[in-house]
Amino acid sequence: MIVDSRVASLVDTNILVYCHDFTAPYKREAARDVLRRGAVNRELRIPHQAMVEFVNVTTRRRGDRDPLLPREEAWRQAEDLLNEFPVLYPNESVFRTAMLGMAAYRFAWYDAHLWAYAEHYGISEILSEDFEHGRWYGTVRVRNPFVELGLA
């Protein structure tokens, strides 16, 4: 898959999950706006990892609270994401790059894997709240859309 890194951003799981989190209404609206703009501008990419994590996170119980979504609704939302955005899949290079990211930046495994997708596919930006906002990791800059809105 060829990705135009001048316009593409990689979306982390937390952005996808916040779209359905009614306990954080401002972040929910901000996350939905990120996806709306990304769909219109065709600028967002979703890593396969985020799709897997999205279904897991939205369908599991949260302590004594119900899941964010019933299983069937999470599946429907995942289908909508698959239909709306290009999904990037891992390969050996992504895996090896993730190991380098763990060593170079001391990332946790899933963060390293997310970063590796961006490095491998030539995407210059990750949208996430799980990294340091504005920092460059190799050729990839992290942007936390919630910081920009004063929500972080």
Regions inferred by a protein language model and the residue ranges of each:
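Short, conserved alpha-helical segments within structured domains
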Residues: 47-51, 73, 94, 114
